[in-house]
Regions:
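DUTPase catalytic domain/fold
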Residues: 2, 6-195
Length: 195
């Protein structure tokens, strides 16, 4: 028989009422906030108007790989398999007391769209738009403003000594409503830009 989990091991997901309370306190910020997007224990986010693709066919983790950004046309844009697309949420968010997780909506998953490769978790203190690492199993037409994912908020056990927005080493603190390319190169020291 398994022993009961200690309180520190139990992950608590915020309910709709707890999310609203946190928004009223200012510990969670969602802009624009639309009440109809609040689920039972999540908040729906939407695809912003921009996509980007990497300019080079082979990426280098030690370098700042250039991207080409474009606006999604009104008639939509067809994503194709084998290509990584960087998207962005239409919503700006802040999370000061909870750990935010971004997950795809089931309707999006049923179209074969993945909205993040590995980066679904945010940090306490993350204050920005969410860049999406999008890929598809089949060609699929997407549209700016379509529901793309949902934010889930977890309680944190203990005081956070270094929130993301106050860390000098945080790589994604510059607020931008545009897709942001990988900053992995900063882990290797000084930026090594492609020539």
């Amino acid at each position: 028989m398994r022993p009961p989990a200690s309180p520190a091991m139990v992950a608590m997901i915020l309910s709709d009422t707890r999310i609203l309370e946190a928004i009223e306190r200012g510990s969670i910020v969602v802009r624009p906030f639309r009440p109809e997007c609040l689920g039972s224990n999540s908040y729906d986010v939407h695809l912003g108007p921009y996509l980007a693709v990497y300019s080079d066919g082979a990426l280098d983790a030690r370098r700042d790989n250039p991207i080409q950004e474009f606006r999604i046309p009104k008639e939509g844009f067809v994503l194709v398999p084998g290509q990584l697309y960087l998207g962005v949420t239409a919503e700006y968010t802040e999370t000061h007391e909870h750990v935010p997780f971004l997950e795809g909506k089931s309707s999006v998953g049923r179209l074969g769209i993945d909205i993040h490769s590995t980066a679904g978790k945010g940090d306490v203190g993350f204050c920005n738009y969410w860049t999406l690492e999008m890929s598809v199993k089949l060609p699929v037409r997407i549209y700016a403003g379509m529901p793309i994912g949902q934010l889930i908020y977890f309680e944190v056990s203990g005081k956070v000594a270094h929130p993301y927005d106050r860390k000098a080493s945080a790589k994604y603190r510059t607020v931008s409503p545009h897709p942001t390319s990988s900053k992995m190169f900063k882990n290797f020291g000084a930026a090594r830009r492609r020539r």
